[in-house]
């Protein structure tokens, strides 16, 4: 099985090392890192941060215990080598090494640039096998697109393009893992009208194939229309597009069912009828999985040559710098990432 390739290279017998990128420095990412450092998640993983000293200093007063557990380094030490007098520390690489003032709640050009610099450095560490997985904290897509990289649409596409992956759906997929439900998205960050144009038989087969290759298990395809079209009364896409794609998938030997009524398919997955739901557009899948996970879903990118996960929330500029950021989502993601690295997830995973 590929969990984002190469995951679990050494983690069956050793702690997984996870590298976390800071996200937008004006968001809650830096505070979340300090909260994580103040109360490390456990003995089954080792953490390293790629984060600006300036960003962490800006919120140091909110979590002083976390700051005390950081060790700023030029290069990552050997695994398990971040101790000081018997105390376990978290290695931090500053991707910018510039003194500046970070203002929580307002993303400026420097914050967008720092987010990209941290992401690129963290990716390089995973690709060099210095870490087993990448966990990304939220960036502001619009800020990066405005200040640094026109056309930027988010981590998923950016990371895929950096690996030479060309087409969403065929080559890589956005997926979300909740404790009792797993969802992949046929279309990703698209306006709804455009996303519906992307619901084609070819796209469905591409996405199903990607999901089978990188995860496996029983896959239920969500319908597009209420009641999955009600025999054509409420729409014919199920009969003309989705059902033929499912039939072809089954001819290929894939364990696929549907199209199922969108108002029932997610509950059936939670009850064990399937391992995955392939949702047709962003909010169809995300509303269901976020409701089920109660803020603790893990965003997992299938198809990358390394394991990458992320939280299911955004930068939260409205509460940045106030000391009220909740790190429970990040802790859930770390636990899920360790399980992915060990091959314990996803549910219904391929074993060969």
Please place each PLM-identified region on the residue numbering:
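Anion-binding alpha/beta catalytic cores of soluble intermediary-metabolism enzymes, centered on
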Residues: 2-237, 243-352
